Amino acid sequence: MHKIVQQGSKSLIESRIKRKSLLSKVVTDVSQLIPYFQNGHYVSMGGFAGTGYPKVVPIALADHVEKNGLQGKLKMNLFVGASVGPETEDRWAMLDMIDKRYPHQNGHHIRNGINSGRIRFADQHLSTFASDLLAGYYTLDKPHGSKRTMDIAIVEATEITEDGCIVPGASVGITPEILQMADKIIIEINTSLPSFKGLHDMVKIALPPFSKPYQITRVDDRIGLEAFPVDPEKIIAIVESQLPDNTSVGAPEDETSSAIANNIVQFFIHEIEQGRFPKNLLPLQSGIGSIANAVIGGLSKGPFDNLSVWTEVIQDTFLDFFDNGKLKFASATSLRFSPPGFNRLFNNWENYKSKIILRNQAISNAAELISRVGCIALNTPCEVDIYGHVNSTNTMGSKMLNGLGGSGEFLRNSRISIVHTPSTRPTKTDPHGISCIVPFASHIDHTEHDIDIIVTEQGLADIRGLAPYERAKVIIQNCAHPIYKPILMEYLETSRQICLKNHMGHEPHQLDKAFKFYTNLSEKGTMKIDKW
């Protein structure tokens, strides 16, 4: 079992609860809260990308299930802005405590549960998830209570203000929305962290027909609240936590990610020279992972100054970007730093906090704002096909990885949409067994109409303004691995010849052969086919 730190200095948690009438809500024995959770309940948690999530109560629930042999008998429908730490939702999945899960996850056991059919999961654009949740789209079949509420919301906070508002920690996600729609609320105050007051800018989302434009034109604009109001009558408990976010040190930059980053930097330089980008570029959006980290690291070393960021998640390499003076300001919904990264943040807190805003994910990922500020989107997919369709979620067309996340809203609405991936990935028997450039993507999350630039370590394909056949040639020549380049080119040219004869040559395919890479991979452990 995970060791729970239930109680620190009484004066410490009291100092974080500025509204003294709420001190009566403090609970030191979390076992008292277990009966509030019933099989089939709709439970929501704060947190985003593995930070700022509640830990003490979810861990206590898992301990209770494990100790009493309740696996499969106490199952929740779980709603989180994105992913949370493995000691919470992934352990819940291991103990068969999750029935439904929306809209994004990251963990071995929860992924296995989804792909084995044990957990009902659907990914969703993160920008619209909160409003859809408020509208009741995800509680339509709720068998008890109101069809538009959560039974319980559990959120992490770093302070409760004098007027009873919640100051979150390292992420916002859907915390404002679940505080509005929950019947009961449990607040975990993490006293191992400093108060994050002043870092957030949170708004109450209005649903149509009452929605209005978000008055943001610059990444550092503020339109909301530093702390979010909560109905004190809904609060059933306040629990002290001293557990850190369970993050890890990212994979180090390697030769492949470095080459991808360099290709992108050179493209940016070219766009500046051609007058399509200003010298300080446009606001950057970067996904999560080693390649994304390498790209941001490469930009921080590049000839760019006075940059800004409009993204979902800020990672370790952004700290280097701040420290060398090239990054002016960053807006996100989550800070996902490694433990050393968080130490850097806290040791220079006053400097960093004046350069960062954390917003609702409904704001950080809003199509309206991504388009208005003119983002440069940078995301890592599973695969890209020769016409520019992108698969970000389902390998072999069927196996869910993590979910769509925010890639859809950024790739669809940014000024420039860039996807970057290694040209190949290894299998157990072949170091180049999987080509990330394929004839026809086995699952499509982002269409050919959304993508401008494709980058691998082999090169960069600028497909803006190109017809499908032109796109395919550029993608194969510039991005495919040399092993797969002739195989893909043969498929393209043969498909074109056949389709032109039949007057269907706009975007040529041979449907009897389009997925042969995948069948060969299943049968032989490699996409290196012998012949078409």
UniProtKB/Swiss-Prot annotation:
Q: Known catalysed reaction(s)?
A: acetyl-CoA + H2O = acetate + CoA + H(+)
Record has Cytoplasm as a keyword: yes
Q: Does the keyword Hydrolase apply?
A: yes
Q: What Enzyme Commission number(s) apply to this enzyme?
A: 3.1.2.1
The enzyme class is hydrolase
Disulfide linkage: none
Subcellular location(s): the record lists: Cytoplasm
What GO MF terms are annotated?
acetate CoA-transferase activity; acetyl-CoA hydrolase activity
Tell me which UniProt keywords the record has, alphabetically.
Cytoplasm, Hydrolase
Tell me one GO biological process term. acetate metabolic process
- Any one Pfam family match given in the protein's UniProt record, by short name: AcetylCoA_hyd_C
Q: Which PANTHER family match?
A: ACETYL-COA HYDROLASE (PTHR43609:SF1)
Q: What does this protein do?
A: Presumably involved in regulating the intracellular acetyl-CoA pool for fatty acid and cholesterol synthesis and fatty acid oxidation.
In the record, the note on similarity to other proteins reads: Belongs to the acetyl-CoA hydrolase/transferase family.
Protein name, UniProt field = Acetyl-CoA hydrolase
Organism name: Dictyostelium discoideum
Gene name in the database record: ach1
